[in-house]
């Protein structure tokens, strides 16, 4: 419990930019990974901390009477969690889970500090070579907007499916 709390607090309480620098440069003597691998690791670990907190709050949002009722019907704690609590918790948490996914798309731009070639990095290179900063970064904004819009549409479809008892 203490280790998990420390993990969540550390990664939620420090900027991803600093985490990326620490993982890539600070741990380089111990791990020989490239920038992309370090970037994927830091986004995954950072997201894991936020997702743990989202799921925890989702579980706590389920009325205590639900688990008491399941236990009184003879279900085990594992069955209660699997069949009663988690389905409701995921349904309650899905908007926050979707928001975290959208944030990940946008936060990937921070990985350019460790040399990951991504959209922002490419845009900066193009803008520097063409001296057309306004147009280049406007296009970059539109690409990010398209990516997040597509993700939002897909997440809304999934959320409707989750909330519709006929489609489940």
Language model segments and positions:
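Transmembrane alpha-helices and adjacent helix-loop boundaries
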Residues: 1-168
């Amino acid at each position: 419990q203490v280790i998990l709390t420390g993990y969540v607090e550390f990664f939620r309480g420090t900027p991803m930019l600093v985490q990326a620098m620490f993982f890539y440069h600070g741990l380089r003597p111990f791990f020989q990974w490239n920038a992309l691998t370090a970037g994927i690791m830091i986004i995954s670990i950072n997201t894991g901390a936020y997702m743990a907190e989202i799921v925890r709050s989702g579980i706590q949002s389920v009325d205590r009477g639900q688990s008491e009722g399941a236990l009184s019907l003879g279900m085990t704690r594992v069955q209660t969690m699997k069949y009663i609590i988690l389905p409701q918790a995921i349904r309650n948490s899905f908007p926050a889970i979707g928001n975290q996914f959208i944030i990940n798309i946008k936060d990937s731009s921070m990985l350019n500090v460790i040399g990951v070639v991504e959209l922002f990095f490419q845009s900066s290179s193009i803008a520097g070579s063409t001296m057309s900063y306004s147009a280049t970064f406007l296009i970059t904004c539109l690409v990010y907007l398209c990516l997040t819009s597509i993700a939002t549409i897909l997440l809304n479809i999934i959320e409707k499916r989750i909330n519709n008892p006929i489609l489940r």
